[in-house]
Swiss-Prot record:
This is Putative HTH-type transcriptional regulator NMB1378. GO terms for biological process: regulation of DNA-templated transcription. It comes from the Bacteria. Pfam families: Rrf2. It comes from Neisseria meningitidis serogroup B (strain ATCC BAA-335 / MC58). GO terms for cellular component: cytosol.
Length: 148
């Protein structure tokens, strides 16, 4: 399993958007400059984020992007799901057909890892990251204490 650049950049760009949206729509060129992410790459990512209902685009003078919901209601799992084709630790894509049509010996292990990762990322919102950054506690985004 790998979190690709798409997922990482999408989370970074969404955090930037959330932190700079108080003054109105944010231009992708501004995010590109602040985060050192190519503008064309951001355009591709924001197309996916818009289709997933996480951002809205505003046209015209002063146009750009805004969050489609408050930062407290957008979690990291949603962002990664919109940007990545698939974030999955199983070899079979969670179809349980990895060993000649049947689940392999470690299928449940990887499925449980998927669930744990999704639970954690689903518990972390843009707002929680911003608050911890503003409080100077950037060393630990959100402590995950519930392991099955």
């Amino acid at each position: 399993m790998r979190l690709t650049t798409k997922g990482r950049f999408a989370v970074t760009a969404m955090l930037d958007l959330a932190m700079n949206a108080q003054t109105g729509a944010v231009k992708l060129s501004a995010i590109s400059e602040r985060q050192n992410i190519s503008l064309s790459y951001l355009e591709q990512l924001f197309g996916k984020l818009r289709r997933a209902g996480l951002v809205e685009s505003l046209r015209g003078p002063g146009g750009g992007y805004i969050l489609a919901a408050p930062a407290a209601r957008i979690n990291i799992a949603q962002i990664i799901a919109a940007a990545e084709d698939r974030l999955d630790a199983t070899q079979c894509g969670s179809k349980a057909n990895c060993h000649h049509g049947a689940p392999c010996l470690t299928h449940d292990l990887w499925e449980n890892l998927n669930k744990t990762i999704n639970d954690y990322l689903g518990s972390v919102t843009l707002q929680s990251i911003i608050e911890q950054k503003n409080n100077g506690d950037g060393s630990r985004v959100v402590q995950f204490t519930h392991i099955h």
